Amino acid sequence: MATSAAVKEEPATQFAKDQLKAIIERIERLEEEKKTISDDIRDVYAEAKGNGYDVKALRTIVRMRKQDANERAEQETILETYMQALGML
């Protein structure tokens, strides 16, 4: 019976380990970049608030600009219908 020290690692096994390590390191690097970007976005919103802008409205506009025009129009129609039903318009 061979001991673990005497067993030579197969090249395919070493390749898989190296590949896994590279993937994990890439994910960690991207997570750090994501945190940095989130901090930058938060700073921009703080700057906007300091200049008197309504941050909630800015966030709504940013979210709406990401939507497809048809999807946004449909959502606005539904919102308007609900507001009319509740006597808000």
From Swiss-Prot:
It holds the Pfam family GapR_DNA-bd. One of its GO terms (molecular function) is DNA binding. InterPro entries: GapR-like, GapR-like_DNA-bd. NCBIfam families: PRK13694.1. Belongs to the UPF0335 family. HAMAP family: UPF0335. This is UPF0335 protein RPC_3979. The lineage of its organism: Bacteria, Pseudomonadati, Pseudomonadota, Alphaproteobacteria, Hyphomicrobiales.
